[in-house]
């Protein structure tokens, strides 16, 4: 099951996150009752405060770990001002998969290992958090051949012991 992306709308004071919780909490419970797991993919808006709390913290509190997991996106955590490794640790046990996406100067997506995210820490925390899948995701290759970018990301991961 999926729900399209919605961004943080400061004009609405984050009201749509309240709406999301109200609408999707029963959905998450129904999925759980039927042996499925509801997943949430973050962007940068979840690292803004709404009513004095980061949205991602509120989501983690409102949905129990057995109701909703997170597909943490390392790039968007960093764009939002967070530390991806720290958030992997905070959401431990709720991250069956994470999106590996590197961050380059100027808010650009980069090949894994060529930006400024400390992936050695990310890998360490992901292992401790019980993450089973780390998925390379580079939405924008900034004019480069996407297959070349994928190969360089793959080579970086292999250099860190992943096959």
How should these model regions be labeled?
Residues 37, 50-72, 76-163:
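Histidine-acidic metal/acid-base catalytic patches
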């Amino acid at each position: 099951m999926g729900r399209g992306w919605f961004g943080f709308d400061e004009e609405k004071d984050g009201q749509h996150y309240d709406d999301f919780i109200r609408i999707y909490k029963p959905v998450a419970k129904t999925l759980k009752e039927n042996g499925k797991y509801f997943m949430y993919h973050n962007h940068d808006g979840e690292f803004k405060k709404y009513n004095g709390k980061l949205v991602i913290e509120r989501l983690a509190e409102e949905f129990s770990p057995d109701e909703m997991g997170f597909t943490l996106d390392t790039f968007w955590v960093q764009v939002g001002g967070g530390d991806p490794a720290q958030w992997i640790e905070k959401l431990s046990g709720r991250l069956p998969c994470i999106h590996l996406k590197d961050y380059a100067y100027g808010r650009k997506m980069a090949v894994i290992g060529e930006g400024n995210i400390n992936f050695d820490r990310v890998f360490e925390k992901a292992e401790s958090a019980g993450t089973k899948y780390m998925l390379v995701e580079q939405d924008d290759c900034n004019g480069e051949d996407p297959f070349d970018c994928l190969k360089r990301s793959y080579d970086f991961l292999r250099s860190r012991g992943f096959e």
